[in-house]
Amino acid sequence: MAHGPNYRVKYRRRREGKTNYYKRYTYVINNTTRLVVRLTNKYIIAQIAKFNPKGDVIVVAAHSMELAKKFGWKGDLNNTPAAYLTGYLLGVRALKAGIKEAVADIGLFVPVKGSRIFTAIKGAIDAGLSIPVGDLGIKEDRIKGVHIASYAQKLEAENPELFKRLFSKYLERGLHPKDLPSHFEEILNKIKSGGA
């Protein structure tokens, strides 16, 4: 892989796809508190981070695994409703810690309207955190999981075998997917009532 004498190797964390140094530089210069949202294959992680020369300090954090362990969430841990609940949980914790505003940091993810990252940010905004963002393009039905419930009902009627395979974890945890919107409201009320 020859490049020539003028080739400049990028920083390691940029090569690994972990850090966008141009954006990070602007956050550091402005000394802003950041709402960091990261998606993994299984979970959603949301954190409030402040810059420190020795390394960023995480002030408060929320992990979608907490929804299952502390609040009894039986749905998937990385879908749209879980993203909203994780963001909402982070917003409640941030307000308790005295943080009232933050700037959204989505890292190297491509910003797509209605995505899970923006759903988590919307959850934090609805909890009372002030975050300067434009139109997030998120529909309330998708936040509550109505689209998942309607797809599950349609699939159960057309192909019960595929339904059992795709929604096996829901059924294993004791939640029928058609009940997801009501279960979402139940967990949201638990978080609102001081469960954070």
UniProtKB/Swiss-Prot annotation:
Q: Any idea which UniProt keywords this protein has?
A: Ribonucleoprotein, Ribosomal protein, RNA-binding, rRNA-binding
Gene Ontology BP term (one): translation
Q: Which domain of life does the UniProt lineage start with?
A: Archaea
GO MF term set: 5S rRNA binding; structural constituent of ribosome
Alphabetical list of Pfam families matching this protein: Ribosomal_L5e
Q: Which Gene3D superfamilies match?
A: 3.30.420.100
- Keyword Ribonucleoprotein on entry: yes
Instruction: Spell out the GO cellular component terms annotated for this protein, sorted alphabetically and separated by semicolons.
Output: cytosolic large ribosomal subunit
* Cross-referenced NCBIfam families: PRK08569.1 (NF006342)
What is its biological role?
Answer: This is one of the proteins that bind and probably mediate the attachment of the 5S RNA into the large ribosomal subunit, where it forms part of the central protuberance.
Identify its protein family: Belongs to the universal ribosomal protein uL18 family.
Q: How does it assemble?
A: Part of the 50S ribosomal subunit. Contacts the 5S and 23S rRNAs.
Q: Which PANTHER family match?
A: LARGE RIBOSOMAL SUBUNIT PROTEIN UL18, RIBOSOMAL PROTEIN L5-RELATED
Protein name in UniProt: Large ribosomal subunit protein uL18
Source organism (scientific name) = Sulfurisphaera tokodaii (strain DSM 16993 / JCM 10545 / NBRC 100140 / 7)
